[in-house]
Amino acid sequence: MAQRPNLLSHLQDLVTKFKNMTMAQDRFKFVFTANEAALEGVTDPIRLPNLIRKAMCLARAPISKYKVGAVGRASSGRVYLGVNVDFPGLPLHHSIHAEQFLVTNLALNYEKDLCKLAVAISTDGLEFGTPCGNCLQFLMEMSNALDMKILSKPKHEAGSFSSLRLLLPNVLPKGSPFLLEKRYNCLTLSGSAGEICSLDCSHLKRRALAAANNSFSPYTESPSGVALLDNDGNWYRGWYIESVASNPSLGPVQAALVDFVARSRGKMFNKIVQAVLVEKNNASVSQERTAKIILDTIAPNCDFKVFHCSVDCAKRLKYLRETLVIDTLGDYTGLHY
């Protein structure tokens, strides 16, 4: 009988440790299911600001000292966070905007759209408004851009959503491809680099190739992907996301670093020990030099390798056969490279 209090105390300690561990994990959470978001107070889109402080705490702004958070809801019901990321020792044009982070987060989780967006424009996270012009361009290239709503909220007021189309209309030429649309670039590794295991092996260059096959590069046709490995053996990936306006484009290293920030639970960039870039040989836009500059600066002990790829004509033909839709008028739709 005398042991029961000790057993109860032990169980209470275990419960406390579990709760603390769960809270620590939640601290670095960038993706919320609808139920998880509801537990954070986001029961409908107008309450997206309830997650903004959590987002701002996750921002990495050692240079600008200005932490920005963004919270968005997809049609799946999941809620995503975006944060700004500066890279110590690098010019600010390499930085990632919070809205870019959020859209990349959506892409890495294979979401199809972004329905509602709240971006903090004050350091206290109480005021919400229009994204910067750079990010508006990025957002307008999504397939549902005309239906997307942006929260406008002065301090201590309820706020309301406005249509994105009113902020930046007609930025895409008719027939332009859209961000977040499913893509397969039909790439294969060139030469001896392709002689590795099977398509589902875990080699970092195979993961980088898979990322490159998801890359959105319809204007320069220079798809590329990056895979990273940290000191604990965890891997991350990202791909080049191109904008019709050029400058808002996000490189594959930055996209992979979005994945790293979102899933590494607070690790510093110097914990990245390996990186692989896969891109086309003689691509009109090469990522190699930029990737090396970024990784040499933020992860000086990282082993960086580059492998080249090319379009596999047999895969491309098979892909076209499987995805091409021909309507009764002979028009071709559903084709994305």
UniProtKB/Swiss-Prot annotation:
Annotated GO biological process: cytidine deamination
Cofactor(s) named in the record: Zn(2+)
Coiled-coil stretches noted in the UniProt entry, renumbered to this chain: none
GO CC, alphabetical: cytoplasm
PROSITE patterns: CYT_DCMP_DEAMINASES_1 (PS00903), CYT_DCMP_DEAMINASES_2 (PS51747)
Residues that bind substrate: N84, V85, D86
Domain of life: Eukaryota
Residues reported in the UniProt entry to bind Zn(2+): H97, C132, C135
Domain CMP/dCMP-type deaminase: 43-164, 199-320
Active site: E99
UniProt keyword list: Hydrolase, Metal-binding, Zinc
Enzyme class: hydrolase
Note on how the cofactor is bound: Binds 1 zinc ion per subunit.
Catalysis: reaction(s): cytidine + H2O + H(+) = uridine + NH4(+); 2'-deoxycytidine + H2O + H(+) = 2'-deoxyuridine + NH4(+)
Enzyme Commission number(s) of this protein: 3.5.4.5
Entry-linked Gene3D superfamilies: Cytidine Deaminase, domain 2
An example Gene Ontology molecular-function term: identical protein binding
Family assignment from sequence similarity: Belongs to the cytidine and deoxycytidylate deaminase family.
Protein task: This enzyme scavenges exogenous and endogenous cytidine and 2'-deoxycytidine for UMP synthesis.
Subunit composition and interactions: Homodimer.
Protein name: Cytidine deaminase 2
